[in-house]
Amino acid sequence: MSSFTEREIQNQFEEVISQTSVTETETPAIEWGEANPSKRPDGMDWDPESNILTYDTWEAQRRAIETTNQEHTDIAAFLAGYGSGKTLLGARWLIKQALQYDSSRFLALGIDFQKARDTTFRVLFEQLPGDRTGIVTSSYNGPEESPIVVDYNRKDHRLTLVNDTVIKLGSADRWNRYAGDSYGGVWADEVGHYGDDLHDLLEMLGSRLRGVGGPQTQLFTLTGNGKNAAFDIIE
């Protein structure tokens, strides 16, 4: 009959605990809260016991969120100045949708991969609960430090959450890059800088909102950039 030391039993117990995933309990949920800098200086709070992630919002952001929730909304736009939290809103909205719909696919778009890496994607990673989630180096995958992420494949630009939903990290520099794929929703950041191909991109993305769970909505976050394709579409 085998016997185990107290240390061996403790090690086995810790191993079982470490292998217990959040997916074995309840899928994490996101709640919208009102800004409370003294309580949540980062504008977000993660409660691991309840699996609830709270994102703070201000009035204009809440109006944009309400627009995305309206029935038959194809496109919602949040137009605001620099430092207004528009990219924060887009990232948080996308994460909420991705957690709400299991085994689905969502798309986060930046101007191009180089610009998005240091802005759109970085902000998206920073909105994940956990420590140092926004840091990505040759030897460190920050998003994988989040309790709601199971994998970040930087080669394929793919973030997989604990509910098996994938967030595809995309680029708008070629309008037909994602033809043939399916998405439950799309967040397009800095749309005002996409150029005249935005009309073709919009038509293509609209045809891709099918086949998987999601609100079937596109959220544009942008700063005004004159009378261009984005202006025409929003008007």
Segments predicted by a language model, with ranges:
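Phosphate/NTP-binding elements of NTP-utilizing enzymes
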Residues: 2-235
